[in-house]
């Protein structure tokens, strides 16, 4: 059974994002109070705030961890039109701060002219790369050519999406059969604009990102988007948080059916669509195997979704904002799966305060 622990975050305004590190033992939160806090889990499983600092001059929308292979590195993005990269430094043995850690700003990315609404590190097999998206509809991809020098980042790609961007997700697949891919969601409120999820794929020939797909069935504002971890699947699974929860599969068509040397074409299917939240859905997050999806909405609940052996998705559990299960929703369903979902689940639980974001 999942055990809920309430954390007094002590932010002075709305918490917009919660992010766990690779091992699930560190957590970062960000808020409209312009600060980021880092939390560490102790041996008794309690969370303690080990760092808190003012990061931006506006609301901080998102915070994300780099893979630990690159050190203890965070990125944040803000209404102040910037993204920032932070690194944790531990005092040297001859330092009066011996053994104590503090976070240092390594760079500020200032290319956007509007609010930077999301920031995500690329999968580690791509090297130390970072993507941002902005309200002006531009996705920017940066690279740190020297992973030992995080003050130097070069802008590698600019992708114009033509719609205001609210969220991005890298495809985590490390298979050589899959080119690097990034999904972009738009929170444009115009009901006349269809296709508020766009998929961009890296083309080795042109060395640029090109639009591979537009999910035309998504016409409502998108708040979050997440590719599922790909453990040997030949297709991709994408979750979308909008006025409901949607799960899509993207099956690559054979190369001879795609344009020669061009982007991959996909056969897309909506495999699940749930309006159980009866409200806006703000966050979606997968467990590490890509088999359980957690979603959080303005109804104050986190809902867990899983497919059965027939690939039919259904709700397998509901948690209220205080972490308690609703009714007997978990009984006899989970076995060990809930533990594997807990990181994404906690992420969603804490993300329920995201309603009303995008204001300074």
Swiss-Prot record:
The keyword Nucleus applies. Keywords: Cell cycle, Cell division, Centromere, Chromosome, Chromosome partition, Kinetochore, Lysosome, Membrane, Mitosis, mRNA transport, Nuclear pore complex, Nucleus, Protein transport, Repeat, Translocation, Transport, WD repeat. The keyword Cell cycle applies. Signal peptide: none annotated. GO terms for cellular component: GATOR2 complex; kinetochore; lysosomal membrane; nuclear pore outer ring; Seh1-associated complex. It is found in: Chromosome, Centromere, Kinetochore; Nucleus, Nuclear pore complex; Lysosome membrane. InterPro entries: G-protein_beta_WD-40_rep (IPR020472), Sec13/Seh1_fam (IPR037363), WD40/YVTN_repeat-like_dom_sf (IPR015943), WD40_repeat_dom_sf (IPR036322), WD40_rpt (IPR001680). WD repeats lie at residues 10-49, 55-96, 111-152, 160-210, 217-258, 276-315. SUPFAM superfamilies: WD40 repeat-like. GO terms for biological process: attachment of mitotic spindle microtubules to kinetochore; cell division; cellular response to amino acid starvation; cellular response to nutrient levels; mitotic metaphase chromosome alignment; mRNA transport; nuclear pore organization; positive regulation of TORC1 signaling. Gene3D superfamilies: YVTN repeat-like/Quinoprotein amine dehydrogenase (2.130.10.10). Its main location: nucleus. GO terms for molecular function: structural molecule activity. The GATOR2 complex is negatively regulated by the upstream amino acid sensors CASTOR1 and SESN2, which sequester the GATOR2 complex in absence of amino acids. In the presence of abundant amino acids, GATOR2 is released from CASTOR1 and SESN2 and activated. Component of the Nup107-160 subcomplex of the nuclear pore complex (NPC). The Nup107-160 subcomplex includes NUP160, NUP133, NUP107, NUP98, NUP85, NUP43, NUP37, SEH1 and SEC13. Component of the GATOR2 subcomplex, composed of MIOS, SEC13, SEH1L, WDR24 and WDR59. The GATOR2 complex interacts with CASTOR1 and CASTOR2; the interaction is negatively regulated by arginine. The GATOR2 complex interacts with SESN1, SESN2 and SESN3; the interaction is negatively regulated by amino acids. Belongs to the WD repeat SEC13 family. Component of the Nup107-160 subcomplex of the nuclear pore complex (NPC). The Nup107-160 subcomplex is required for the assembly of a functional NPC. The Nup107-160 subcomplex is also required for normal kinetochore microtubule attachment, mitotic progression and chromosome segregation. This subunit plays a role in recruitment of the Nup107-160 subcomplex to the kinetochore. As a component of the GATOR2 complex, functions as an activator of the amino acid-sensing branch of the mTORC1 signaling pathway. The GATOR2 complex indirectly activates mTORC1 through the inhibition of the GATOR1 subcomplex. GATOR2 probably acts as an E3 ubiquitin-protein ligase toward GATOR1. In the presence of abundant amino acids, the GATOR2 complex mediates ubiquitination of the NPRL2 core component of the GATOR1 complex, leading to GATOR1 inactivation. In the absence of amino acids, GATOR2 is inhibited, activating the GATOR1 complex. This is Nucleoporin SEH1-B. The gene is seh1l-b.
């Amino acid at each position: 059974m999942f055990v809920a622990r309430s954390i007094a975050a002590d932010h002075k305004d709305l918490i917009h994002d919660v992010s766990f590190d690779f091992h699930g033992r560190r957590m970062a939160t960000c808020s409209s109070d312009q600060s980021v806090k880092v939390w560490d889990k102790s041996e008794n499983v309690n969370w303690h705030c080990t760092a808190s600092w003012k990061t931006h001059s506006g609301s901080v929308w998102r915070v994300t961890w780099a893979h630990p292979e690159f050190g203890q590195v965070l990125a944040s993005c803000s209404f102040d039109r910037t993204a920032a990269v932070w690194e944790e430094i531990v005092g040297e043995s001859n330092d009066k701060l011996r053994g104590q850690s503090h976070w240092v700003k390594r760079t500020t990315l200032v290319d956007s002219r509007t609010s930077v609404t999301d920031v995500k590190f690329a999968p580690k097999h791509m090297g130390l790369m970072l993507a941002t998206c902005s309200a002006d509809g531009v996705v920017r991809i940066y690279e740190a050519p020297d992973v030992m020098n995080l003050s130097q980042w070069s802008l590698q790609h600019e992708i114009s999406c033509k719609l205001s961007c609210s969220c991005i997700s890298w495809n985590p697949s490390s298979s050589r059969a899959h080119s690097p891919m990034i999904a972009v969601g738009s929170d444009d409120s115009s009901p006349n604009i269809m296709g508020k999820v766009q998929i961009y794929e890296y083309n080795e020939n042109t060395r640029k990102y090109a639009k591979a797909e537009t999910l035309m069935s998504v016409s409502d504002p998108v708040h979050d988007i997440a590719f599922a971890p790909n453990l040997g699947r030949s297709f991709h699974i994408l979750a979308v948080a909008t006025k409901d929860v949607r799960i899509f599969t993207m099956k690559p068509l054979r190369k001879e059916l795609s344009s020669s040397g061009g982007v991959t074409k996909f056969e897309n299917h909506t495999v699940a669509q749930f309006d159980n939240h009866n409200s806006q859905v703000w966050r979606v997050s997968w467990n590490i195997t890509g088999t359980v999806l957690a979603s959080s909405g303005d109804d104050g609940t986190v809902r867990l979704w899983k497919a059965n052996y027939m690939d039919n998705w259904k709700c397998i559990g509901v948690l209220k904002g205080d972490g308690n299960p609703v009714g007997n929703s978990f009984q006899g369903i989970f076995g060990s799966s809930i533990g594997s979902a807990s990181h994404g689940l906690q992420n969603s639980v804490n993300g329920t305060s995201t309603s009303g974001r995008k204001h300074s």
